[in-house]
Amino acid sequence: MLKKLTTALLACTAFALPQAFALSVLPEAGVSLGVGTKEQYAEAKVLPRTTIGYKRADRDQYGNQNAIYATYNVIGSKVQLLGGWRNNIDEQSSSTSFYGGIGIAAPHILGLQPYATYVKGSHFAETQAGLNYNIAFGWGLNINYHNYMPEDGDNEHGVGAGVTFHF
């Protein structure tokens, strides 16, 4: 069942554009806090098309990575450019990396929003495909599949889940 769900999510987004982090779509203003299986983040909408944030990711083999990032809405909030700086990348030739990428989100359907992201840094690449669900009163649920590919070492991939609160 999970394999079919993951395949369906990838198929829905693959036709839009080539496809990691959970792509949240903030309203015109606000702050979003989230915690997931492998990460915690906080982000804020600072301009109508720009969001900045901080993310802490727990990597099995590579320690706890910190990222400071920004997203820029290119086409509404459905296509976003992603960029940032990540540190504490263990076992790499350098422990820091600037990165950039793209995020694509489909329109909401019955409170569900599929998305996919791809980011590439000088020492890693990461993809994520997932599904956001708006529960109520600013609360949301996220289910995703991520694939973290370091320059040196083994890939880390798996299914994750998380909750988000927008205020």
Model region roles, listed by residue range:
Residues 1-30:
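Cleavable N-terminal export/targeting peptides
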Residues 19-67:
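Short glycine/proline- and aromatic-enriched beta-strand/turn motifs that initiate or cap beta-hairpins
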Residues 39-43, 67-69, 99-101, 128, ...:
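Membrane-embedded beta-strand positions in outer-membrane beta-barrel channels/transporters
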Residues 44-46, 72-74, 87, 102-108, ...:
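Residue-level signature of outer-membrane beta-barrel architecture
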Residues 48-54, 75-83, 107-114, 135-143:
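Repeated loop/turn-to-beta-strand initiation elements of outer-membrane beta-barrel proteins
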Residues 55-63, 86-92, 117-126, 146-152:
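Sequence/structural signature of outer-membrane beta-barrel proteins
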Residues 154-167:
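Outer-membrane beta-barrel "beta-signal"
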